[in-house]
């Protein structure tokens, strides 16, 4: 149980936390391989395997999240392709109620995401997340992903917050680990970031 009297700042992840991760998973594993095959030619199944291998090689780095990087690497307009399936962008069922409650509280609410600005802008366009958030910060602004403890140091340097009185809600184990190592005291995660996938028993 969270002691809200002990929290001044709430740091919220976006993809998989406030928004259903199904959109992102569908885009990268199904829509992108199909459209790549249509544009560049080739067998979609083989292309899917090749793309997943290239993408997974960047996991945990800023490139993993960078639409400019993937547009350059794949010779595609990734943002335009993401718009093609933007109808799948959706908040989790409890998101709006949670955000309304936070807005009515004493807490300062920040969106802290690894999403590239192009992806972030698209999702803000298709949701009302921005109405409930006082600060929106992409890790691309700081040049380092949330998986790195240095990210949290830079975040605090730019926008002061007390880690001992902050809550981070995130669906990624490595992000929660880096935040804990930095000293963020209150951590919370979700058991089902993607509504089309099974509940997680743990973060491992």
Where are these regions (language model features)?
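Residue-level marker of regulatory loop/turn positions in helix-turn-helix DNA-binding domains and
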Residues: 91, 112, 144
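Short active-site oxyanion
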Residues: 106-110, 163-166
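N-terminal helical cap/lid subdomain that shapes the substrate entry/recognition surface
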Residues: 2-97, 116-118
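Asp-based, Mg2+/Mn2+-dependent phosphohydrolase catalytic module
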Residues: 1-10, 100, 116-117, 121-204
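Catalytic-core regions built around general acid/base machinery
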Residues: 94-106
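Flexible coil/turn residues that form the inter-helical turn or adjacent wing/linker of helix-turn-helix
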Residues: 63, 105, 172
